[in-house]
Amino acid sequence: MMGACVFAYPNMIVEHYTAERGLSNNIVNCTLKGKDGFVWFGTWYGLCSFDGTKFRSYDNRDGFYSADIPPRKIQRIVEDKNGFLWIKTIDRKLYLFDKRHESFHAVYDDVKEYSENIQIIKIQTTEDGDVLLLTKDKSLLRAHTDKDGKITMKQLHDSRPNVNVYDMRLKHNVF
């Protein structure tokens, strides 16, 4: 005796958004639904938000201005516990976006004291809302922002002594 189940799904509406409908670029590398209810898109041309009705681009082409140049070619976006967006680009740079003030901060100076090679390979949030950063030289950092966006970093692992400087591979398996 065999049993079979059939499930019916209600009619679903799927919307397609393109550059013609307000998205900054048709190439979307990543998305994030923020705590604020906005959907954030990492596109080839930069950061874009969607509030459910309209898009907003955060780049210099649309009259947006930030002290630091807005990132382009975004590969990954994560949100920390204070609502700041951490943005990793394809060229392995890292930015912090303050949604309240609509401004970017290049995180170069914050990372360089912990790593000789400040290229960021991976970003990920922790369960408590901090952000883990893995650099190209395999250093692991834990980053935290306060309510005003001030960044504090702690080095969890320094692989520099274990990295072959000629090909950036680990000499020993330290992870």
Where are these regions (language model features)?
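Carboxylate-rich, polar loop motifs that coordinate divalent cations or form catalytic acidic clusters
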Residues: M1-F175
